[in-house]
From Swiss-Prot:
Additional remark text: HIU hydrolysis also occurs spontaneously, but more slowly.
Enzyme class: hydrolase
UniProt xrefs under NCBIfam families: hdxy_isourate
Example GO molecular function: hydroxyisourate hydrolase activity
Gene3D superfamilies given in the database record: Transthyretin/hydroxyisourate hydrolase domain (2.60.40.180)
Protein name: 5-hydroxyisourate hydrolase 1
E.C. number(s) listed in UniProt: 3.5.2.17
Subunit structure: Homotetramer.
């Protein structure tokens, strides 16, 4: 799939609640570019009913090489889930990663439970 400036590169994510076996819907995600000492907030979004964002977090001309950080606001999500307690163990989960090829697809899934998480570079 080609986007805005002809490059197919994009950044996407998907959040799954492994405790419930369902997508983590309405989970807030902030995307930062890391340069120097002050992270720059690029965007904030929420996951849809499928645990995905409605649009790529980066694509086309916004897809630059560099270091980025996704901050998943798991505490908000876990605290509002009906079957969870009022004080979740996890709060904001930062995942820092690098983009070396602006024409590549970078997919950063998050598998989330009340007491742990895992991630990997997906496809």
């Amino acid at each position: 799939m080609q986007v805005q400036d002809g490059t197919p590169g994009r950044l996407t994510t998907h959040v799954l609640d492994t405790a419930s076996g369902r997508p983590a819907s309405n989970l807030r995600i902030d995307l930062y570019r890391i340069e120097g000492e002050r992270p720059e907030l690029l965007s904030s979004t929420r996951t849809n009913d499928d645990g995905r964002c409605d649009a790529p977090l980066l694509n086309g001309s916004t897809m630059e090489t560099g270091t980025y950080e996704l901050r998943f606001h798991a505490g908000e999500y876990l605290g509002t889930a009906a079957e969870r307690g009022a004080n979740p163990f996890l709060d904001v989960i930062p995942i820092r990663f690098g983009i070396a090829d602006r024409a590549a697809h970078y997919h950063v899934p998050l598998l989330l439970s009340p007491y742990g998480y895992s991630t990997y570079r997906g496809s």
